[in-house]
Amino acid sequence: MKHTSLVLLTTLCTGISNMSVAAETSTVSVDNADRIRPYVKDVRYWQYKGEPVLLLGGTKDDNLFQIPDLKQHLDLLASVGGNYVRNTMSARLDKGFEVHAFRRLPDGKYDLDGWNDEYWTRFENLLRWTHERDIIIQIELWDRFDYTDARGANHWQVSPYRPQNNINYTGEETGLADRYLDDPWRDKHPFFHTIPGMKRYDKKYDMLRHYQEQFVAKMLSHSLSYGNVLYCMDNETSTLPEWGQHWMGFIRKAAAEQGVDVYVTDMFDDGWKPERSEKIRLELDHPELYSFVEISQVNSRNFGEDHWRRLQWVVEEVKRHPRPINNTKIYGAGKTSWGSGEPENGVQRFWRDIIGGCASARFHRDGGGTGLQPISQASIKAARKLESLVKLWDVEPRNDLLEDRSENEAYLAARPGEAYALYFTDGGSVGLDLTGSEGEFQLSWINVGTGDWADKQMLQSGNVVTIAAPAAGGWVAAITRHDSQD
């Protein structure tokens, strides 16, 4: 049995290691000022290379760096205007092409002190190819579904961290069991309780945390050189916040050693009901810990006006400590029992997120969402056309300017008297209050279902103007002062 000597430090209250992270692999050079960061003129949004950006995306897998046709998939995303991907550091052996991060020995066991070069080459390729295409990556370090045997998943059975699968420690030494059959949301796996001070922490877990930190340090040796990376600690975690806060501190310390700025957050499972979530409250109240707000779970279980209401609750609360609000997952496929909805629900959520003041919107992978399917491509193309006339950082949600509006019929973002973005979920007509404005406005229709331009029309200001969508289905209208079109 091979063992590693541990040196436990108390650099921070969370026990962050003193491990220095050097850029061992990546050679790309990025000016710190050009890295992804909140937009200097409106911190609700991001800027990249000094320019404001609206992050839009959709991809077919969550551990994106593992897919064999990655470069082609990124090219397709970029071709429709996408600039945002999600990447979990997962290695679930679901589809036959995934590999683990650690060196596998001839007897089939893993050595957690050695690396699988293929895994890290794939990750480096993702970093390099997205960098070349100006695509922003939102990385998730940990996914609770990677370590469960619930419902026949058997992911823990093949995990290198399972004591029976490696040469580095035993179950007795670490307190790790042979099987974990509980659903991940129950948060019973010791893997997520390795931080001193957590309620379920046991000193036996220190050895496991050593290897966790070694893995994250290796990841950062690749990613910190790139300026197109955001960091989210977990996928829909139900673990206590101390877990994610440890990893946020670990990443910040490593970035500080290299003199670069990074932006970190966590994703909480109960974000679908944010007004009742103590963890979301913590995230909102502590911008010094959570650099941006990741609210993806609001895009599940919530439909129509309820989705808008809960999203706007977050938007209003964030005004106390303004930061970007990201949606790296928008559900909308499969009609699951827990509320993913159908594809049209995903499209509506995507547009409510954009009109509602969010900094990013990405369709969840196939199976949970519509990924980069044609329906997603059309919405991304339509959103870019809208953005060509109405910059979302120049407007804010203003449904109060709409009259004769039915529930979930239409949503508005506006800078009154200057620019309006009006989204219809499925045809319909509403009154738009243009009183107090002067001159003419040009309305340009965009078909959400195809991503194509449609008709234009002129609107006279000074009163409430009735606007009717050209047909059934999703439509968005870009309404701007006529003199701004000249």
Where are these regions (language model features)?
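Conserved beta-strand positions
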Residues: 87, 233-234, 295, 327, ...
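Boundary at the C-terminal end of the N-terminal hydrophobic targeting segment
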Residues: 20-23
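Active-site mouth of glycoside hydrolases
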Residues: 28, 33-290, 303
